[in-house]
Each structure stands twice: as structure tokens, then as C-alpha cells.
């Protein structure tokens, strides 16, 4: 079974058609796979879609449909939600010190990266991320990362 972790930048492509959406949609059709997100992505996804409403990219109705589709993916276990723990927060602080002094590692990304690293110790095959700066940081941490906007994921 292939296990994927979707950063929010990749996850949003499941619910809003844009560059990289076809690659993300293809993951969801794989038979023997598991897709994991952090509980933080629930908030980040809502924020990203709300921004699309404010900027006129989608309607409020489309926002509600996308959130409903996301909830359906979670309820049907199409997506597994992992909870950030205290150890992840401690690890995120260390990652900010390691990377934040030289690169633009943001707070929420450091939390996502801490979870990715924890999961990679036992069950993670690949990270999907559509933020090239963050992809570079993830890669420096030794994880396999693909950008759905640039890479074929199959």
C-alpha cells in the first residue's frame, strides 16, 4: 500500500480545479493507497477556499460544496486525518530554528513538516506539496516530495 501525505497546498487541488488537480485526482483513484493530512489542514483548507471566494475565483456556493466534498472524503475515510501532538510542536520549533533562519519556513508549514517527519519513520512513502519553497525544505529533511504542478505522480 502506498501512503501519501498531502500538504494543504496540494490538498486544495482536490476541491478546486487548478494546475496540478489532475495529478491529485489520480491519487484518489489508486486502489491500494492511503492519503493522510494533518488536522491543521482542515483549517488551512477552509482558509484557502475562503480566500478564493474573497478574490472572486469561486462563489460562496462553490465554497460550501467544496467543504462538503472534503467532509465526505474524511467521513468515508478517503482521507485519514492525523492529529498534531505536543511532540510535533516541539519538533516544529526546532525545524523553525534549523530552516527559518535561512529560508522562509512558515509557522504552519513547520507544524506540517514535523508531522511529515514523524509519519515518515513508520508509514509514509511520499509527500505531495505545491509550494516549491516548502518542497525544497521538505526534501532537505530527507523526505520524498513531489509537486503536482510540476511532476507526474504516477
What would you call each of these model-derived segments?
Residues 1-3, 118-154:
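Acidic, PIN/NYN-like endoribonuclease modules and their adjacent C-terminal/linker elements
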Residues 47-54, 117-121:
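Short glycine/serine- and small hydrophobic-enriched flexible loop segments
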